[in-house]
Structures are given as structure tokens and as C-alpha cells.
């Protein structure tokens, strides 16, 4: 018998009628199922025993043969073979159809494969199949074409005229005949020739048709097989019929559908035998077509076949589709035996690798092990009595239970399992009660809390499974978060509070200033209460006297030997940093021991501190009232300005929001200072927030500051701020406003959780086959990673960005010019810091985006495995990890919105350009005009370039200068010397920079900082000027985009008319006139304002500042365009944004990008509601490029402006597809990674870039063929880029011309459906469509990914399941005994060793497993012996 693991691939094809008959064990002729009296299957019916096999094991239908010894005998009386009843799950039957019927998948799906082959539309096919029109099969000399449709009258006329030569048909027969006459080879050749002759054919249908023809040619399928003569009947056990109480039957819907087919087929046979009139026969044939269609795919039809209770029947297709379908319900998700679930409670006494297992559960879960053990120890004579003993819960059962459970790891899982840390292994410790005990530090990984959460427990049974659980899944091996390499096991809540208390310092506490010689003395002093835990004392530590506190001394005792003495107050963030540091320096074993000790100390001292919160602890800042009054005055002032018409209503609104945001921040500061002073810095509310144990600044602000601004349900901010806090109590109106946000939070949570889950599912689907498959793909390509800045603030340092990557080039020390880090060095945290110290701000590294591995990815491109901080191993399923890392925070974030209770966080708008250090203004670029106040104003977009002033000297004070103007200096380089009183001092550079020598002034300047400046910005500095830190370089209007007059003159309106496209409003409050440009659909107006010779195009929503004929001066604002009102930014905006990016959707108002470098020419042309601009290239060889921009959109460029390729020409969001087409793949990579990261960064979530890169790489795997050359591709065909390269190499070797293609970006869903594996695609979405396509192409699934292997029940090809590990032969003895004793004296040592083994390699593990296979019996005997020895002890 073949082993189920022995096949390498699965092919899907169309079945020919002969093949269907080969499968079949007999024809089903009757629609009957079972006899209602005898309850036995009817002969020749849908459950017939003769066809499908016997219902009782080893017994025929009539009972003549009743025993296994007649195996294989066919009964001469009833014709049933004596066999196992299991064959009823595999034997098929068939129905011979009286007339051919078209398969619904091939004619109804879009695009219709049948239609493409015959060059007919679905409606034309339908009219032939449903007997409305005839189709010409052989036109003879009639002048008509084959495949044309004619009606009945025409048909008879042609028959009379041309006799038997003219052939036309109707119904399935005709379609079958047409398909059979297609010569696939010849047709494909003709179309290819056509495409080459015409070169550019826009009709996509031709390419589609060629694709289908070639699919049939290459797969060996015949087109006429899409029309069925024989329908297969699936085995009866797969469409069962069960008796319910009360004598009724429940049956699968398929039986009803089959019965309809058989009934209609039999009726048709009778009608044909009786030579019934054509009209009746045709009607019956049409009904048969309907019935077979409904059987295969009922949901595809407009009028579905309904069963009892008007419910649509589930057809064969419906059984595969959707969440409840075969793929997702039964093949990808199965129920697990030996599992249980219970409520969890906290187990502070547990070690990190332990969980508390209730005895009741253990008894049930380990039943077979206990039974075997009872029999082995002769406490029970046989298995049956052992079982009875367990059920009676005898005393000796519990003794045995202890030994059975002892070294047997179990898996704990909490739903939803959003990332791999949602399932971890622990060693069980038996506990009383019914609740599972969980270690408090693993809660974060599971996202568990103890408010009624439940967890599931699973028992690994096989020795191999136990070994793998032990070496890979035990909790000490899962200390780090795979998303970012940070510890996920950090202490929270009570523990943090205890550690904060323990390590803090109090002034003037008892015993302050005392000296001690060591820890023992200090502990004695604490016991005798001569010194307090938080007093400042001096202690002799490692030969030095240090100032510290007893608490810190105690804390440092639990730190590993050799770790630096920690002498500061620790909050949650600091503690986490220490854990990360210890992990990197000492490994997981020591870290785990330390974690347990920190947990012990934390709980102990939180108990000693024993904080409680009362209403008096919530201190309101005394300055609050004054600050609120000031704010009210400022708001009034803004109202005043608005009434006078100085600012618009929108500007006023934004100003008010900004005033309240600032006031709220000031009140918060004051309140925190107040709390800090209270109770010597130990106000419980303050301590909880400051230590990071619970609560945040945001929440305490609402308790003791002011609640601040709230958001409407729409997300807009209500300008009426809530001035009260919860301590004072809210007014009625304030309370009412508050309720919006609170509800929105809860509603969002419910809706978004589902969205985040769906995002994760799509991410997993696209990246599940990315597995580390080789060590190095050898690519020369790489990416450049640099510091991430927002303005001038560094958000992500270089060391953080390049952590865990391989360098792609040699890194040289700029001073000594020696290679410090050669190419292909793995960058650890320490190395990253060194690279940063060398003065690099960007370096080239290897990246998943540029990996050339055909299947999966290589170690060098992927870099470090973030969960273990070692290079990723071959077999690591990095795609799935990437998907989980991106998807998991999505769900988290959506759940986190409601904690703030809807308080809006408005971002304060900057009004000035400034830099946070002294700097030199290098140059000011742009068109500047002088306004009425004498200030210089930018009339077009420009830039200000500044350099940081690092050092400044007067050369006269220096004795020697060794550098010249413009020279580059590295950090620490000597560039001058100065004679001091006695010796010569050498002067070195503080930072890398460039030398500027002007006269006697020597400056060292940082790199150019380019500040983009918008129109209307007022300049506050000059070229060559030194500007102090945080002083304004320029000032702008943050709320509006403006247009500035470049000359003085008279306003002339062109295509602007009040009442048509200009709305004239009078503001009711201020009586000012507002002129707003509105959209005008009917007339093609191109609104412009002309001043002198300059024209300014006016977009929709612009507010005109002057009327027609008004005089303007140079630098006046002609019109303003209000920028969109700020909505609050939270992941509610963020999750859809991530979704949009990964699905590569084109944004609604995408901006237009310049396709080449050149000058703008604007002739004012209008074509089809669009303005036409031209870009004139520099070189005369290039042609000018035409750009169409919708009327009403704000254009960013004007006549004569110079643009670069990829520059934005109008307002709007970037379209990723445009970026790919114009700027290329690397710009797109950068755009997608940075945009996704921005959303997560806003929420404070850290995800390593490489995870996003893995997904983006999978989105860019396809190429669209633009010119097929001599390859087998078709134009417009989408092919895998590796396949594209392989085919091109083949053609070039044969001397042909290769194909040309452009990379194409596919969204998650599209890319998943286009994977090479049809199994993976079919189980994702659009199951029938995928299978239809795969069957026609005769696709073979090579089972390379994880998903397809799970579906067919193979081991997944990752980790220890990789093919290369399956055939390992081992020739040496078993290495020692694997029974480890964790509860012995050397417990901690053992645990350290166990955890040190954390980065156990998959290869090692597989060897162990293989060795175990070799000698499993021996191992069991050995284990038994060792158990006996235990008993002797």
C-alpha cells in the first residue's frame, strides 16, 4: 500500500466521460434512496449496496455470506461484494445522461471558458443551451460563419436551400459538436500570428482566448469534456441519510439534487423512447440542464433550487466554499482530542516554565498514560479495570498521576491566537480546584487577564511531539516578541509597582547617611528597623563605596553576577530594557531565573507598599482656574478677529481647538507637578502612572486636570472643551458631550476586531509559503536604510533600523579608512551602536525585498530571527511570522481605542519653520516678492537650506589650521591646534561635518537640511545669517494654502461668475462677504484670476479675497484654500489605512506624478473635464509629455516651473501603482514600508521593517508581459517574475528574443488568488473560480507552501517537517536519557541549561527525533526501567 506521505504533488484536470465511468462501480438508475419499511438501500438507487458496497461489515445484502472469511466474494444472489463498510466512503457511481449537458462552472463563470473557446458571449451560449436559438456548425455555402446564431425560421430556410450540407444544432449536443471540432493547436497559432502582425491589440478578449486555448493544448484536456454525457455520483457516506427519533430522516441536500437529476433523466429517456413531440423533449432537456447545473453549483443560478422551509439547497460547490466549507472547516481547522478548557487564575508561586493543572482535568487528559502505568505497576490487572479505578478516583490513581504528569509538557492556548505566542508549552504542576493557574509574566504574550478569561490545554502524545514541544515551545524559549525582538515577558501592574517602590529613594528617611559594609548588615538593619528600605545610605560594594538605598541593594541581588549595579528608580520601561539587556548578554536561561526573582520581589514589595486610592489623592492643580480663564479670553479674542473678518470661521475653529489643546497640556503639567509634590512623591495615583503600573497621563488628566476636547461620532472635534474633571464632576452638557466618545469607542472595537482578523487572514495567506530555504541567494541588490526623522526629531535611530540585518557592503571607519565591518556582517544591537558612532546616517543592507531565492527566502536577506536573536534558520516559517506580527497589533489597537473614553487628541499645528539647534542659513530658493509690510513672501513653492553649526572659531586664535574650505571632517578628526599657556592643544571635530572658511571665521557645519516651503510663507531670516535654536526661519499659515500676487495690478476674473461658480455668502455674525468657488458641472469653466500677465488657476472650495476689478499690491493673498479639518487620529483611521496599503487600492483622489524631468507648459487647454498641462523635457530627443488633471483640483505647479520625475503636480494622495510605474520598485518599497510603519508608530507599536518587507515582496511577485518576444507568454499575461526570468534565459540560450515585462503590484487578495498553489488559493476565496481555472490548465500543485500540506495532511515543509529531514538515517546510539528532573535540588541549574538550549536548531531537533524513531522500543524500555528505579527510591 502507498504511504500517504509518498506523493509529491497533486494535479487537477477535467474528467473525460471514459474516466468517470472508470471510477464508477455501477450506474444509478433510480431516484430511490432507502426502503422505508426495511430501512435497507433500494437496488440501483442512490444508496445501492451493489454499486457502493455493503452497509454492514463483511455481509452481503441478502445475508447469504456473513463472515470475514468470504472477503472479496461477490454474492450470486444479490450481487453485493463481501467487504468492509468503509468502501462506501470511496466507491463512486454514475448517471448516464440521455442528452449532453453543459457543466455550469465552464459556461456560467466569468470569463466563460466555453464562451472564450467558441468566441461567444454567456448570453449567446445560454440561448443555445436553453433551446432558444440554433448555432451554425457547418455553414456550407450559405455565406454565414460557424458559431453564428440563427432562429428557427432561418434554420428551416437554410435546410430547404442547402440540404444536408448545412449543419446547425441546438442545445448541449450542438455545443458539444462545436467544441469537438475545435483544433486547439491551429487556433492558437492563428491568434498568435494575428497578435504579432497587428503588434498592439487593445482587445483583451483575444489574449484571454489565446490563454484558454493554450491551457487546453498544454494540459491535454479536450474542450468537449466541458459538456457532460455522464454525471459522477459521489459515495453515499459523503452524502449520508440518518434516521432521527420519530421515524423521520435527515438527509444531505445532495441527495435531493441527485434525485432531481435522475427523475428528469429517466423521464427524458422515456420521452425519447416514445418519440414524443420535439417541444416536450426540448423542455425536458432544458430541465435536465437546470438540474445538473443546480447539482454542481446551486448558488450560481439566479433562481436557486429551494428545499423545505424555502432554504436554498447546498450543492457540491457550496460544500467547498466559505468558512463552513470543506476547506476551511474540516481541512484547515480540525478539532483536537486530549484537550480541555477552563477558567484561568493567577499563579504567583509558579516558576516561569510551569502552569497549574487541576487534578480533575489531569485525570481525564492523561487517562491512557495513567491506565498503562497502573497496569505496569500491577495496581490493576487489565486496562478495563484500570479505567474503572480512574473513574472511581481511587487513592493510588493520584499517586500514579503525579509521576505521569511530572515531565510531560502541555500546551496552553488562549483564543484569539493572534500570533505564535498565543500557544506555549508549560510543565504541569497539579493543583486543587477547577481553574488553570497561569504564570503572571506570560499574560502579556497571551493577552490574558484574570477577569474570567478561559484557556484551552492540549496534551502532546507522541514522544516526537513531546520532544518538539519541550525544545521549541516551552515558555522560557519564548521570552522575546517575534515582531520586534523586545522582551514580551516584562513585569506589569503589581510587580512594576513593587519594583518602583523598592528602587525609589525618599529624602530624610530613617537611617539616612549611615554606612554599611555589605548586604548582610543592611538586611539586619532593616529587620531591626534602624533603616528604611528607601533611605539613602552608603555601602561597600565590590571594593567601592557607593551611595544607594537598601531597596536597590536587594534588587541587585537578583541580577545576574557580573551585571552592572543598577542605582536608579525603575519603572516598567526601564525594567523591560534591563530584561532585554540581560537576555542579550547572558542568554535565556539566566533571564528566566531573574524574571522569577523580579516577580517575587515585585509582589512582596507591592504588598509592603500597600497603596490605596482615595478621592483625596486626586489633587487638582491650583493654577487650573487661571489657565482656563486665560484660555476663555484667547477664545474670545479669536471670535473677535473672526467678527472683524480678519480670519475665516474655519480658521477660528482651528484656533479655538489649538487654544484648548495647549491649555489642557499646561494644566496636565501643573497637575503632575502637584501630584509629584504630594505625599513625598508617593501619592498612589501618581506612583501608578509614573511607574507605568496602571493608568496614563491621559487618564489622570481626566481625573484631576480637565477632560479636554471631545470628538463627535463622525470623528470631528467639538470645539466646546470640557473644562471640568471627574474629581470636580461634569455639568449636564459636558456629560452629554462625553457620552459620544465613550460609545464610539465600544462600537468601533466590535466592528474593527473583525476587520483586523480578516487582515491577518489575508496576510497569512499571501506570505505563508515564504520559508527560509537557503543560506545565501547571492544577490547583489540591496536597500539603503537611514534614520527616520519627523522634521528634525529622530524617531527611529539608525541602530534600531539596521538591527538584525546583514550589511551589503564593507563599512569603513571614515577617519582611519580601514574596513571595520566587512560585507555580510550580522548587525547586533552593539554593532548597530558602533556603526552609528562612526557617523553613518544610512547604510546599505540586505533585504527580503531584493532576495532572489526562487522558493522562499534566504538567511542573508532575511537576517536575524527576532524571537531568538540568532540568524534565521533554514526551515523557519518567516512569512507566517511576518503576517502575525503585522496582524496582531491591528486587533490589539482596535481594542484599545476605548480606554481614553473618547477624549480627542488634536495635534497642535506649527506656524513656523524652526530647527532645534544653532544653524547657518545656507540658501533660500524660490520666487520671493515684497509685501505691503516690507516682508519677503514666497510667491511659489521653494526651499530653505540650513546647516547645523557644530563648532565656530576665529582662525586668528589658532596657531595652525590643517584644513581647507569645503573639506569633509569626520568625528574626532584633528583639524587645528592652539598654543595654550604651556603646551599646544589639538582641536578635534565634535561631529562629522563640512568646513566653511570665510575670512577669519572657521565653521564646522552639519549636512544640508532642506526645509520645503509653501506659497505665502513670510521669510524671517536671510542667507548667510546665523539663527539661534528654535528661532523662526519663516512663518506660514497652517490652516490654508494660498496664492500670492507676484506683481501689483488689477484683478481680472476669468470663467468666474457670481451665481454660477462663485457663491456669495454674507457671514451672519460678522456681516463680511465670503466669495467661495463651487463646482460647476454643466459649463466647462476653467476659473482663473489674472493679475497683469500672470494667471492663477482657482480650485474648487477656494475663498476669493478680492472682487473682480479690485486693485492688488505685490505679495497680497489673492485666494485661500482651507486645508481639511483635523479629525482625531487613531487606528480607526489607521486600520483601514493599513488595509488600503496592503490591498494596493487606488486612492479616490490620487495625485498626478510627473513622468519625466522638465518644464511645465500651461496653455489653458481643456479636454473632457480635464485641464491639460505639458512637461517639456530638457533633451530634444525626448517627446513632451501630456498630463491631464481634473478641473477643480488644486494644481501645485505653474507655467515655467521645473519638475523632476515623480514630483507631485496636484493635491491628493499617492497611488502606489503610479509610484511603481514612474519611480520604480525600490521607491514603492520605501513608500509602502514607511506608510505602514507610520500608522503603527502613531499607536506606539514597534514592528520590525523586515516583516512588512516580506509581505510587500509577495505583492510584487508578478510581471505583466508587454512584448512576448519568442517566449510562450501572451501579451498582457501576468506571470511570476522567477518564471519570467527562467523562460527568458531559455529563449536567449536558443538564440531567440526575450519577453519584455513590467512589474505589477497586486493587493493581498489578488496576490493570494494568483499563487502558484491552487490548493492555497481555493481555500482562501473564490473557491470555484480558482478550481475551474486550475482544472482547465491541468495545474499541478507541488505542495511547496504550508497551507496546501495542512490540507492534504502532510507535515508542513517548515522546521522539522522539511523534506530533507524526513529521510535522515542515524547510525549512532541514543544520547543518554532524555528524562530530565526539574524538581530536584539542581533545579535552577537544570532550568538554565534547558533555557540555554533555547536556540536549538531545527536540524539538531530532527536528528534527535530521527534517532528516537530508530530505537523507540528501546527508549520505552529504558524509560520503564528508570521509572522502576524511581519507585525503588
Swiss-Prot record:
It catalyses: RNA(n) + a ribonucleoside 5'-triphosphate = RNA(n+1) + diphosphate. Zn(2+) 2 binds at residues 777, 851, 858, 861. The gene is rpoC. Residues 1383-1393, 1411-1433 have a biased composition (Acidic residues). This is DNA-directed RNA polymerase subunit beta'. SUPFAM superfamilies: beta and beta-prime subunits of DNA dependent RNA-polymerase. It comes from Leptospira biflexa serovar Patoc (strain Patoc 1 / ATCC 23582 / Paris). Its EC number is 2.7.7.6. InterPro entries: DNA-dir_RpoC_beta_prime, DNA-dir_RpoC_beta_prime_bact, RNA_pol_asu, RNA_pol_N, RNA_pol_Rpb1_1, RNA_pol_Rpb1_3, RNA_pol_Rpb1_3_sf, RNA_pol_Rpb1_4. Residues 1383-1433 are annotated as: Disordered. It comes from the Bacteria. It is an enzyme of class 2 (transferase). Its cofactor is Mg(2+); Zn(2+). Binds 1 Mg(2+) ion per subunit. Binds 2 Zn(2+) ions per subunit. One of its GO terms (molecular function) is DNA-directed RNA polymerase activity. Keywords: DNA-directed RNA polymerase, Magnesium, Metal-binding, Nucleotidyltransferase, Transcription, Transferase, Zinc. The RNAP catalytic core consists of 2 alpha, 1 beta, 1 beta' and 1 omega subunit. When a sigma factor is associated with the core the holoenzyme is formed, which can initiate transcription. The keyword Magnesium applies. DNA-dependent RNA polymerase catalyzes the transcription of DNA into RNA using the four ribonucleoside triphosphates as substrates. GO terms for biological process: DNA-templated transcription. Zn(2+) 1 binds at residues 60, 62, 75, 78. Belongs to the RNA polymerase beta' chain family. Mg(2+) binds at residues 449, 451, 453. One of its GO terms (cellular component) is DNA-directed RNA polymerase complex.
Amino acid at each position: 500500500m502507498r504511504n500517504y506521505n509518498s506523493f509529491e504533488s497533486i494535479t487537477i484536470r477535467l474528467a473525460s466521460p471514459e474516466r468517470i465511468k472508470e471510477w464508477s462501480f455501477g450506474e444509478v438508475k433510480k431516484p430511490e434512496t432507502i426502503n422505508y419499511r426495511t430501512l435497507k438501500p433500494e437496488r440501483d438507487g442512490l444508496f445501492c449496496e451493489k454499486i457502493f458496497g455493503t452497509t454492514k461489515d463483511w455481509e452481503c445484502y441478502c445475508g447469504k455470506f456473513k463472515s470475514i472469511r468470504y472477503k472479496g466474494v461477490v454474492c450470486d444472489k444479490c450481487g453485493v461484494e463481501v467487504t468492509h463498510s468503509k468502501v462506501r466512503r470511496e466507491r463512486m457511481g454514475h448517471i448516464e445522461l440521455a442528452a449532453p449537458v453543459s457543466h455550469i462552472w465552464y459556461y456560467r463563470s466569468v470569463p466563460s471558458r466555453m464562451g472564450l473557446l467558441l468566441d461567444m458571449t454567456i448570453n449567446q451560449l445560454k440561448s443555445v443551451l436553453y433551446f432558444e436559438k440554433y448555432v451554425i456548425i457547418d455553414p456550407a455555402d450559405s455565406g454565414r460563419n460557424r458559431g453564428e446564431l440563427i432562429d428557427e425560421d432561418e434554420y428551416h430556410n437554410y435546410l430547404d436551400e442547402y440540404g444536408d450540407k448545412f449543419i446547425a444544432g441546438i442545445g448541449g449536443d450542438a455545443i458539444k459538436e462545436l467544441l469537438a471540432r475545435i483544433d486547439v493547436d491551429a487556433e492558437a497559432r492563428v491568434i498568435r500570428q494575428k497578435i504579432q502582425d497587428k503588434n498592439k491589440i487593445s482587445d483583451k478578449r483575444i489574449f484571454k482566448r489565446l490563454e484558454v486555448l493554450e491551457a487546453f493544448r498544454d494540459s491535454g484536456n479536450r474542450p468537449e469534456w466541458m459538456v457532460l454525457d455522464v454525471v459522477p455520483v459521489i459515495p453515499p457516506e459523503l452524502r449520508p441519510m440518518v434516521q432521527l427519533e420519530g421515524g423521520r430522516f435527515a438527509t444531505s441536500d445532495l441527495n435531493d439534487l441527485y434525485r432531481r437529476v435522475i427523475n428528469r433523466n429517466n423521464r427524458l429517456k422515456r420521452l425519447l423512447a416514445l418519440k414524443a413531440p420535439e417541444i416536450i423533449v426540448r423542455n425536458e432537456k432544458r430541465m435536465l440542464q437546470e438540474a445538473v447545473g443546480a447539482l454542481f453549483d446551486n448558488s450560481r443560478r439566479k433562481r436557486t433550487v429551494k428545499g423545505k422551509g424555502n432554504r436554498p439547497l447546498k450543492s457540491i460547490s457550496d460544500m467547498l466554499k466559505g468558512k463552513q466549507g470543506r476547506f476551511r472547516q474540516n481541512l484547515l481547522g480540525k478539532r483536537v482530542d486530549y484537550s480541555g478548557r477552563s477558567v484561568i487564575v493567577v499563579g504567583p508561586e509558579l516558576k516561569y516554565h510551569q502552569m497549574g493543572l487541576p487534578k480533575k482535568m489531569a485525570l481525564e487528559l492523561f487517562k491512557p498514560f495513567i491506565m498503562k502505568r497502573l497496569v505496569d505497576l500491577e495496581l490493576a490487572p487489565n486496562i478495563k479495570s484500570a479505567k474503572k479505578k480512574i473513574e472511581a478516583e481511587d487513592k493510588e490513581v493520584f499517586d500514579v498521576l503525579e509521576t505521569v504528569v511530572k515531565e510531560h509538557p502541555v500546551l496552553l492556548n488562549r483564543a484569539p491566537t493572534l500570533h505564535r505566542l498565543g500557544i506555549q508549552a508549560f510543565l504541569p504542576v497539579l493543583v486543587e480546584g477547577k481553574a488553570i493557574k497561569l504564570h503572571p509574566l506570560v499574560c502579556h504574550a497571551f493577552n490574558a487577564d484574570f477577569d474570567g478569561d478561559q484557556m484551552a490545554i492540549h496534551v502532546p502524545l507522541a514522544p516526537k511531539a513531546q520532544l518538539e514541544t519541550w525544545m521549541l515551545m516551552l515558555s522560557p524559549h519564548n521570552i522575546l516578541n517575534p515582531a520586534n525582538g523586545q522582551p514580551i515577558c516584562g513585569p506589569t501592574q503589581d510587580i512594576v509597582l513593587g519594583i518602583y517602590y523598592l528602587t525609589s529613594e525618599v529624602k530624610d528617611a530613617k537611617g539616612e547617611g549611615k554606612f554599611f559594609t555589605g548586604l548582610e548588615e543592611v538586611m539586619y538593619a532593616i529587620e531591626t528597623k534602624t533603616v528604611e528600605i528607601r533611605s539613602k545610605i552608603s555601602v561597600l560594594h565590590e571594593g567601592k563605596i557607593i551611595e544607594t538605598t537598601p531597596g536597590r541593594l536587594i534588587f541587585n541581588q537578583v541580577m545576574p553576577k557580573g551585571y552592572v549595579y543598577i542605582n536608579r528608580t525603575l519603572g516598567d520601561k526601564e525594567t523591560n530594557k534591563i530584561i532585554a539587556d540581560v537576555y542579550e548578554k547572558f542568554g535565556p536561561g539566566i533571564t528566566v531565573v531573574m524574571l522569577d526573582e523580579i516577580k517575587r520581589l515585585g509582589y512582596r514589595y507591592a504588598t509592603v507598599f500597600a497603596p490605596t486610592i482615595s478621592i483625596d489623592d486626586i489633587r487638582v492643580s491650583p493654577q487650573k482656574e487661571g489657565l482656563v480663564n486665560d484660555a476663555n479670553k484667547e477664545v474670545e479674542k479669536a471670535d473677535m478677529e473672526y467678527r472683524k473678518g480678519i480670519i475665516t470661521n474655519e480658521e477660528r475653529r482651528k484656533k479655538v481647538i489649538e487654544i484648548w489643546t495647549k491649555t489642557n497640556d499646561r494644566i496636565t503639567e501643573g497637575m503632575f507637578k502637584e501630584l509629584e509634590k504630594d505625599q513625598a512623591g508617593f501619592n498612589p495615583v501618581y506612583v501608578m502612572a509614573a511607574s507605568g503600573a496602571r493608568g496614563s497621563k491621559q487618564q489622570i488628566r481626566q481625573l484631576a486636570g480637565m477632560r479636554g476636547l471631545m470628538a463627535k461620532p463622525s470623528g470631528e472635534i467639538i470645539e466646546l472643551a470640557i473644562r471640568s474633571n471627574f474629581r470636580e464632576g461634569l455639568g449636564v452638557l459636558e456629560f452629554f458631550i462625553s457620552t459620544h466618545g465613550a460609545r464610539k469607542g465600544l462600537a468601533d472595537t466590535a466592528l474593527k476586531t473583525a476587520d483586523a482578523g480578516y487582515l491577518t487572514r489575508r496576510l497569512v495567506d499571501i506570505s505563508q509559503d515564504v520559508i527560509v530555504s537557503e543560506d545565501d541567494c547571492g544577490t547583489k541588490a540591496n536597500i539603503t536604510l537611514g534614520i527616520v526623522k519627523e522634521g528634525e526629531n529622530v524617531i527611529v535611530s539608525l541602530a534600531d533600523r539596521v538591527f538584525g540585518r546583514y550589511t551589503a557592503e564593507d563599512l569603513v571607519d571614515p577617519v582611519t579608512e580601514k574596513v571595520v565591518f566587512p560585507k555580510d556582517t550580522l548587525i547586533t544591537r552593539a554593532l548597530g551602536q558602533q556603526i552609528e558612532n562612526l557617523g553613518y546616517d544610512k547604510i546599505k543592507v540586505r533585504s527580503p525585498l531584493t532576495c532572489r531565492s526562487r522558493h522562499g527566502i534566504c538567511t542573508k536577506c532575511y537576517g536575524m530571527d527576532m524571537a531568538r536573536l540568532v540568524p534565521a534558520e533554514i526551515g523557519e516559517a518567516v512569512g507566517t511570522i511576518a503576517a502575525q506580527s503585522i496582524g496582531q497589533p491591528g486587533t490589539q489597537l482596535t481594542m484599545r481605542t476605548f480606554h481614553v473614553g473618547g477624549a480627542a487628541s488634536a495635534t497642535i499645528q506649527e506656524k513656523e519653520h524652526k530647527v532645534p539647534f544653532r544653524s547657518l542659513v545656507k540658501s533660500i530658493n524660490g520666487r520671493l516678492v515684497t509685501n505691503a509690510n516690507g516682508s519677503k513672501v514666497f510667491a511659489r513653492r521653494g526651499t530653505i537650506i540650513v546647516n547645523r553649526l557644530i563648532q565656530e572659531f576665529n582662525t586668528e586664535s589658532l596657531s595652525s589650521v590643517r584644513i581647507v574650505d569645503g573639506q569633509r571632517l569626520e568625528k574626532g578628526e584633528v583639524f587645528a591646534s592652539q598654543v595654550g599657556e604651556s603646551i599646544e592643544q589639538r582641536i578635534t571635530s565634535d561631529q562629522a561635518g563640512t568646513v566653511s572658511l570665510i575670512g577669519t571665521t572657521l565653521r564646522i557645519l552639519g549636512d544640508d537640511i532642506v526645509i520645503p516651503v509653501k506659497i505665502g510663507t513670510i521669510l524671517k531670516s536671510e542667507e548667510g545669517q546665523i539663527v539661534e535654536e528654535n528661532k523662526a526661519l519663516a512663518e506660514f499659515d497652517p490652516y490654508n494654502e494660498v496664492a500670492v500676487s507676484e506683481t501689483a495690478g488689477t484683478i481680472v476674473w476669468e470663467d468666474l461668475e457670481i451665481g454660477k461658480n462663485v457663491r456669495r455668502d454674507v457671514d451672519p455674525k460678522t456681516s463680511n462677504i465670503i466669495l467661495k468657488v463651487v463646482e460647476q458641472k454643466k459649463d466647462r469653466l476653467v476659473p482663473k484670476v489674472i493679475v497683469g500677465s500672470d494667471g492663477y488657476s482657482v480650485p474648487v472650495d477656494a475663498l476669493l479675497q478680492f472682487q473682480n476689478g479690485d486693485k492688488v499690491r505685490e505679495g497680497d493673498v489673492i485666494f485661500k484654500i482651507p486645508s481639511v479639518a483635523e479629525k482625531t487620529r487613531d487606528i480607526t483611521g489607521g486600520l483601514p489605512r493599513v488595509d488600503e496599503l496592503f490591498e494596493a487600492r487606488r486612492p479616490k483622489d490620487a495625485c498626478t506624478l510627473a513622468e519625466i524631468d522638465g518644464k511645465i507648459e500651461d496653455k489653458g487647454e481643456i479636454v473632457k473635464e480635464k485641464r491639460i498641462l505639458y512637461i517639456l523635457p530638457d533633451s530634444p530627443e525626448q517627446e513632451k509629455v501630456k498630463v491631464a488633471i481634473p478641473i477643480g483640483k488644486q494644481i501645485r505647479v505653474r507655467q515655467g516651473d521645473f519638475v523632476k520625475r515623480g514630483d507631485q503636480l496636484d493635491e491628493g494622495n499617492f497611488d502606489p501603482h503610479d509610484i511603481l510605474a514612474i519611480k520604480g520598485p525600490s521607491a514603492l518599497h520605501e513608500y509602502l514600508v514607511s506608510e505602514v510603519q507610520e500608522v503603527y508608530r502613531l499607536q506606539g507599536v514597534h514592528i520590525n521593517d523586515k516583516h512588512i518587507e516580506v509581505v510587500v515582496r509577495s505583492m510584487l511577485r508578478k510581471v505583466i508581459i508587454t512584448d512576448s518576444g519568442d517566449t510562450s507568454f501572451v501579451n498582457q499575461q501576468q506571470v511570476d517574475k522567477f518564471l519570467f526570468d527562467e523562460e527568458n534565459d531559455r529563449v536567449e540560450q536558443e538564440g531567440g528574443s526575450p519577453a519584455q515585462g513590467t512589474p505589477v503590484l497586486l493587493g493581498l487578495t489578488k496576490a493570494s488568488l494568483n499563487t502558484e498553489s491552487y490548493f492555497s488559493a481555493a481555500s482562501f476565496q473564490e473557491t470555484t473560480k480558482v478550481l475551474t481555472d486550475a482544472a482547465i490548465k491541468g495545474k499541478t500543485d507541488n505542495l511547496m507552501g504550508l497551507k496546501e500540506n495542512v490540507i492534504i495532511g502532510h507535515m508542513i515543509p517548515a522546521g522539522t517537517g522539511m523534506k530533507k529531514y524526513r529521510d535522515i538515517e542515524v547510525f549512532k546510539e541514543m544520547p543518554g536519557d532524555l528524562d530530565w528532573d526539574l524538581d530536584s535540588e539542581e533545579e535552577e541549574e537544570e532550568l538554565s541549561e534547558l533555557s540555554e538550549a533555547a536556540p536549538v536548531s531545527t536540524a539538531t531537533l530532527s536528528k534527535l527525533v530521527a534517532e528516537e524513531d530508530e530505537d523507540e522500543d528501546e527508549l520505552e524500555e529504558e524509560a520503564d526501567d528508570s521509572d522502576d528505579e524511581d519507585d525503588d527510591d
